[in-house]
């Protein structure tokens, strides 16, 4: 050590280099966070660039894995004993809470990435002690290694848990790929504290309890609703409304909601036999010697019957390790009264219950204890619509089991995408409407002849490109929905979306559909081919001969295969790529552009080159001239970037989201723009990309890069091409 270094000085890295010190966004909170476009790359993946999970998992011995999981369920470990000798309830809660973070509005969250291993989810109050479930799974994950992802294993463990307790599940599909660091793009809410009540700083509620979009949980740190009641105040009818909203935001109807609520609480128990004050920090805040485990109780026994998790204490059913419909028989068969758990949480307990209807203690079968219900459970009895469904399930266990099995499959597979992404021997044969089915399309047609007919159809470059873009831009990598495959742009609701310019769209489709029919091609393929033709014509006008890669085989979905309500969440309210937004929003246009780029799986350079190209192709919504910094509209030039970076121009605000570019010398207005244009000159990172494309030696590079990014967008939903 340098003798000049005092004992109080650090001779190596300072904390600012290794810990979460003040970041650029902390110093400049309004700066655009481009980090959301640069996640989950090969630098963070320890499995290497050549590893392909979707190929590796096909080598998995599924029967052996399921046998090991089944054995795990009843192999209680002394460091975290199984309730009644069965880990089923714990494993189901782990899988449920992984899948339950999904929200349909933006497709983010869910079980598809194994994100429950990382902050913030690994330390949410609602996920307390699920770290123990994952540690119990570790020997199995260790054994099967890279052939099974954590994401798949977590969900499969829940499935096997149900099967081990007597439920015939609907099926299972592999294919979920792990991420290796926390997601940076998911907005979980603005609250500054866990479980912050309504009305506090950053509250997610406004008006008459209107939940902020796209959120699908009532509090920061919860998966769905507060089990004690709205803001911790029991009132089953009020809680019923919270339940209905949160489950709807996961695309569940009332029957699925009742089935999932009851099915999740048919097995296992809630834990609150002690004081939460004795619990240590959550995993992310625990000391190094805790080795990633949180909520450890070093003040009392803290395991088995003395476990504290939610604070509510007790099982819901008489036989918590057995699949049946006893949940409804207790819920509907008894009156219930409010009580406090040993941990001080509100819970409902039955009045005058028969001794035989009580579940036994998790450690001593000679002891029987009251079952409990949460406020959400009581909503299944008190809400009239939920009550009717509950009564039917109580009367028909087979029907309840079937509805639950299907709803559980939907819950755990919704963010896996369409059926073409499913892998494994237990894929259900039935096509389900929520899977957005698309038939296989034809491939044996003359692509060249179709392109020739499109090129001579009289449609402009802008019309060709905009129509293809609108068809493909709905794809989102969060839950693999949307995209050009299926040509749903010609069906309700997409054909009537304002962002798709219905009149222009109908005119273009009237030209393209006969071309498809005559050639024996799908309309979906021809729409993409039309965009490709537009790009090729534009490149030629700029002096470059290019052939845009194309793979036939897209199918045409029918209206019957399209759930109109489900697709409404894919409607764009803004598209910075086409310089359009439906109205003014609290969020700036450039932030909405960035969010769409992230959902589309684009990098910052790809976003940059696509915006610059689409501007000069005349693809703006409604023929807007904003950002069209060229005198050669329809030619794929780098004029957008050349103009943007030219200091001969000055930019002058003319409204909230409108600007003029003026010649500095004369003051003459040359062009107009929006924030979605100017951000490429104002943001230091985006300007660096813009300068590359503005260079004199980058004209061809710009064209090549635009084509590559364009093809990526057009093929985003061609999963059969991706392996």
From Swiss-Prot:
For this protein, the record's InterPro entries field holds: Catalase_peroxidase, Haem_peroxidase, Haem_peroxidase_sf, Peroxidases_AS
| Required cofactor names | heme b
The UniProt catalytic activity note for this protein reads: H2O2 + AH2 = A + 2 H2O; 2 H2O2 = O2 + 2 H2O
Q: Which residues bind heme b?
A: 265
Residues at the catalytic site: 97
Cross-link (Tryptophyl-tyrosyl-methioninium (Tyr-Met) (with W-96)), chain numbering: 224-250
Q: Name one Pfam family in it.
A: peroxidase
Q: Which terms in the GO cellular component ontology are assigned?
A: cytosol
Q: Extract one GO molecular function annotation from the record.
A: metal ion binding
The EC number(s) given in the record are 1.11.1.21
Which PROSITE patterns does its entry note? PEROXIDASE_2, PEROXIDASE_4
Cofactor binding mode and count: Binds 1 heme b (iron(II)-protoporphyrin IX) group per dimer.
Indicate the annotated site residue(s) for Transition state stabilizer: 93
Q: Gene3D superfamilies given for it?
A: 1.10.520.10, Peroxidase, domain 2
**Biological role:** Bifunctional enzyme with both catalase and broad-spectrum peroxidase activity.
* Quaternary structure and partners: Homodimer or homotetramer.
**NCBIfam families documented for this protein:** cat_per_HPI, PRK15061.1
Q: What is this protein called?
A: Catalase-peroxidase
Q: Which organism is it from?
A: Leptothrix cholodnii (strain ATCC 51168 / LMG 8142 / SP-6)
């Amino acid at each position: 050590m340098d003798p000049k270094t005092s004992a109080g000085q650090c001779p190596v890295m300072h904390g600012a280099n290794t810990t979460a010190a003040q970041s650029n966004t902390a110093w400049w909170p309004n700066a655009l966070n481009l980090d959301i476009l640069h996640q989950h790359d090969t630098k963070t993946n320890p499995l290497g660039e050549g590893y392909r999970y979707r190929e590796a998992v096909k080598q998995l011995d599924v029967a052996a894995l399921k046998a090991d999981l089944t054995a795990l369920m009843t192999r209680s470990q002394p460091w975290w004993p199984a309730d009644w000798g069965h880990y089923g309830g714990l494993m189901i809660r782990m899988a449920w809470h992984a899948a339950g973070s999904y929200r349909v509005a933006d497709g983010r969250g869910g079980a598809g990435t194994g994100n429950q291993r990382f902050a913030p989810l690994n330390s949410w109050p609602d996920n307390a002690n699920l770290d123990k479930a994952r540690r119990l799974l570790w020997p199995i994950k260790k054994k099967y290694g890279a052939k099974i992802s954590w994401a798949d294993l977590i969900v499969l463990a829940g499935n096997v848990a149900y099967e081990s307790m007597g439920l015939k599940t609907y099926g299972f599909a592999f294919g979920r790929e792990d991420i290796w660091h926390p997601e940076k793009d998911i907005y979980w809410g603005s609250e500054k504290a866990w479980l912050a009540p309504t009305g506090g700083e950053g509250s997610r509620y406004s008006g008459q309890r209107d939940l902020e979009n796209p959120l699908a949980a009532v509090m920061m740190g919860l998966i769905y609703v507060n089990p004690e009641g709205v803001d911790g105040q029991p009132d089953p009818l009020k809680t019923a409304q919270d339940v209905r909203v949160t489950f709807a935001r996961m695309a569940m109807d009332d029957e699925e909601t009742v089935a999932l609520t009851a099915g999740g609480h048919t097995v296992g128990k809630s834990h609150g036999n002690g004081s939460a004050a004795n619990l240590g920090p959550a995993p992310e805040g625990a000391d190094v010697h805790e080795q990633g485990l949180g909520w450890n109780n070093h003040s009392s026994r803290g395991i088995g019957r003395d476990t504290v998790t939610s604070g509510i204490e007790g099982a819901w059913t008489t036989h918590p390790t057995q699949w049946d419909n006893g949940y409804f028989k207790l819920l509907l068969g008894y009156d219930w009264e409010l009580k406090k758990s040993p941990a001080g949480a509100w819970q409902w307990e039955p009045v005058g219950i028969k001794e035989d209807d009580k579940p036994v203690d998790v450690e001593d079968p000679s002891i029987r204890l009251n079952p409990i219900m949460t406020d959400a459970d009581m909503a299944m009895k008190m809400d009239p619509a939920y009550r009717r469904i509950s009564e039917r399930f109580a009367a028909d266990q087979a029907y309840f089991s079937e509805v639950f099995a299907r709803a559980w499959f939907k819950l755990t597979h919704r963010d896996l995408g369409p059926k073409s992404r499913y892998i494994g021997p237990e894929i259900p044969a039935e096509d389900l409407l929520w899977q957005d089915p698309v038939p296989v399309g034809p491939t044996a047609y003359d692509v060249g002849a179709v392109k020739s007919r499109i090129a001579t159809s009289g449609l402009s470059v802008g019309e060709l490109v905009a129509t293809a873009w609108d068809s493909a831009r709905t794809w989102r990598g969060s839950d693999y929905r949307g995209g050009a495959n299926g040509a749903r742009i010609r069906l309700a609701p997409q054909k009537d979306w304002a962002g798709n310019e219905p009149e222009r769209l109908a005119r273009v489709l009237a030209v393209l559909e006969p071309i498809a029919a005559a050639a024996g091609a799908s309309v979906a393929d021809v729409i993409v081919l039309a965009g490709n033709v537009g790009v090729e014509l534009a490149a030629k006008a700029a002096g470059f001969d290019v052939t845009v890669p194309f793979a036939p085989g897209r199918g045409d979905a029918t209206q019957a295969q399209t759930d109109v309500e489900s697709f409404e969440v894919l409607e764009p309210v803004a598209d910075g790529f086409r310089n359009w937004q439906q109205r003014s929003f609290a969020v700036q246009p450039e932030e909405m552009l960035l969010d769409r780029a992230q959902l589309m799986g684009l990098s910052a350079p790809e976003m940059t080159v696509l915006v610059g190209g689409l501007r000069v192709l005349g693809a703006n919504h409604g023929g807007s001239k904003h950002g069209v910094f060229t005198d050669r509209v329809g030619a794929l030039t780098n004029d957008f970037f050349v103009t943007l970076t030219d200091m001969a121009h000055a930019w002058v605000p003319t409204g909230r989201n409108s600007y003029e570019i003026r010649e500095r010398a004369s003051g003459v207005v040359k062009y107009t723009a929006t924030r979605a244009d100017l951000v490429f000159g104002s943001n230091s990172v985006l300007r660096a990309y813009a300068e590359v494309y503005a260079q004199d030696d980058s004209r061809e590079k710009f064209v090549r890069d635009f084509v590559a990014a364009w093809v990526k967008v057009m093929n985003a939903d061609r999963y059969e091409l991706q392996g």
